[in-house]
Swiss-Prot record:
SUPFAM superfamilies: Ribosomal protein L36 (SSF57840)
Pfam families: Ribosomal_L36
GO molecular function annotations of the record: structural constituent of ribosome
HAMAP family: Ribosomal_bL36
Entry coiled-coil feature ranges: none
A GO-annotated cellular component: ribosome
UniProt-listed InterPro entries: Ribosomal_bL36 (IPR000473), Ribosomal_bL36_sp (IPR035977), Ribosomal_L36_bact (IPR047621)
GO biological process: translation
Keyword tags: Ribonucleoprotein, Ribosomal protein
Family the UniProt entry places it in: Belongs to the bacterial ribosomal protein bL36 family.
Protein name, UniProt field: Large ribosomal subunit protein bL36A
Length: 46
């Protein structure tokens, strides 16, 4: 899964990709081609 600062290009990479919001983060998931998975933002430090 790629960590990107912006998902603008990741949304249109593949026709089956969909944008999902989970736990305050934005994910791009693609069940037919999982290599296009991406998440926006980075891990928070404690």
């Amino acid at each position: 899964m790629k960590v990107l600062s912006s998902l603008a290009s990741a949304k249109t990479r593949y026709p089956d990709c969909q944008v999902v919001r989970r736990r305050g983060r934005v994910y791009v998931i693609c069940k037919s081609n999982p290599r296009f998975k991406a998440v926006q933002g980075r891990k928070k430090r404690r």
